[in-house]
Swiss-Prot record:
NCBIfam families: PRK00451.1 (NF001696). The glycine cleavage system is composed of four proteins: P, T, L and H. In this organism, the P 'protein' is a heterodimer of two subunits. It catalyses: N(6)-[(R)-lipoyl]-L-lysyl-[glycine-cleavage complex H protein] + glycine + H(+) = N(6)-[(R)-S(8)-aminomethyldihydrolipoyl]-L-lysyl-[glycine-cleavage complex H protein] + CO2. Keywords: Oxidoreductase. This is Probable glycine dehydrogenase (decarboxylating) subunit 1.
């Protein structure tokens, strides 16, 4: 269908219908200096062939992980994605990012989501998982909102170092609305200071949040943190990396009330930041408080198994003010990628991926620590990524190593921090890591 722009008469008619004199009256909150005063300088009209050629040239300026040896982490990881995954998720029956509204005629999609929920429950050790949320940060914000609704309290305590972007989303969701405050606890050697956390606990704390492994890759004392949360009636929220659960204890095993996570490592490509996958699971007693969509199994009138959307306490179905959340969709395609990834890898395969990440990260960390001018910032145990003190500013290291064919890591200076956050996945070979160390050693 062709696009036909509105004419001046069309615009005047619409403005008159809503009782407005000009378009500018509709956007008074936008400062005038940010409004266009003249037409945009756009490309001249092009044919389809010319547009394709232009886009190819623009795209060629990008530098992506297949072109470099990547050690970037910080929430998005260069894991191997099995070839069969793309073939399966590209089937036309599955290829949608949305949960079907006509659930009765979309049994295949609903079953895939049901299997995803079941696998997430097993992986995280929880009783109920939803059909996914937008990403890990959104899942964390929804977990905090749920905790406040459950407890009636208004303060959230961050026990360790969570991703700064997640922290920003929390502030937008929670603090911007004037509903609550988010308090960051003190860190010692990169992890939560348990004594400081205990001193901050009170009966006004709605939830205690911990990321495991934390943003720095360090492993937190989740048992002690969870015990403190429970002793004050606060909900215990754990943001756990799904790949790490191939080796680490599941959040449900150490008493998490809500478990969330970023599902990107489970078969989703890096994709310049998205779309990703928000994992969200809860203990059984909170099943009616969980946000997002839930797929359940039932029997049809013929006694056959069937799948439905159930417990739909969202704003589409009930009054907005009574909804558990205004999140009313999910990342169906990414959830499908996750369930296909987990199915292809199997329990043993996921454990092997986690083991490779752990061993290779420690191999590289030991090699880098031996270089003059370099040192590990933290002494405690870590999984897959670690922070390195560098002899020059981390941004210099990143730019120099890029010229050598490496994505050297995540410059923590972006977040007013220091050091280089380096991640190692199962894809990295010994030869790549040795070459990386050799090139790092030339920077001083």
């Amino acid at each position: 269908m062709p696009f036909i722009a509105n004419t001046d008469d069309d615009r005047r008619s619409m403005l008159q219908a809503i009782g407005v004199g000009s378009f500018e009256e509709l956007i008074p909150d936008i400062p005038s200096e940010f409004c266009l005063k003249e037409a945009l300088s756009l490309f001249p009209s092009m044919s389809e062939m010319e547009v394709a050629s232009l886009l190819d040239r623009l795209a060629s300026a990008n530098r992506t992980s297949p072109d470099y040896v990547s050690f970037i982490g910080g929430g998005a990881y260069d894991h191997y994605i099995p070839a069969a995954l793309k073939t399966i998720v590209s089937r036309s029956e599955f290829y949608t990012a949305y949960t079907p509204y006509q659930a009765e005629v979309s049994q295949g999609t609903l079953q895939a989501i049901y299997e995803y929920q079941s696998m997430i429950c097993r992986l995280y050790g929880m009783s109920v998982a939803n059909a996914s949320l937008y990403d890990g940060a959104t899942a964390m914000a929804e977990a905090v909102s749920m905790a406040m609704n459950v407890t009636g309290r208004s303060t959230v305590l961050v026990a360790g170092k969570i991703h700064p972007n997640t922290s920003a989303v929390l502030k937008t969701f929670i603090e911007a609305g004037g509903k609550a405050s988010v308090v960051q606890n003190v860190l010692t050697d990169g992890v939560c200071d348990i004594a400081a956390l205990e001193s901050r606990m009170s009966d006004q704390i709605a939830a205690v949040i911990v990321q495991q492994p934390n943003f720095y890759g360090c492993l937190e004392d989740v048992e002690a943190i969870g015990a403190l949360a429970r002793s004050h009636g606060a909900l215990f929220i754990v943001s756990a990396d799904p790949v790490s659960l191939g080796l680490l204890n599941a959040p449900g095993r150490y008493g998490a009330d809500i478990a969330v996570g970023e599902g990107q490592p489970l078969g989703s490509a890096l994709n310049f930041g998205g779309p990703y996958l928000g994992i969200f699971a809860v203990a059984e007693k909170y099943v009616r408080k969980i946000p997002g969509r839930l797929v359940g199994m039932t029997k049809d009138r013929d006694g056959e198994d069937g799948f439905i959307l159930t417990l739909q306490t969202r704003e589409q179905h009930i009054r907005r003010e009574k909804a558990t959340s205004n999140i009313c969709t999910n990342q169906a395609l990414n959830a499908l990628q996750a369930v296909v990834y987990l199915s292809l890898m199997g329990k043993d395969g996921l454990c092997q991926v986690a083991e490779h990440c752990l061993q290779k990260a420690h191999y590289l960390a030991d090699k880098i620590a031996d270089l003059p001018g370099y040192s590990l910032r933290f002494a405690g145990p870590f999984f897959r990524e670690f922070v390195v003190n560098t002899p020059v500013d981390a941004s210099v290291v990143v730019n120099t190593m890029m010229e050598k064919g490496f994505f050297a890591g995540y410059d923590l200076g972006i977040h007013d921090d220091s050091g280089l956050l380096i991640a190692v996945t199962e894809k990295r070979s010994r030869a790549e890591m040795d070459s990386f160390v050799e090139n790092l050693g030339a920077i001083s």
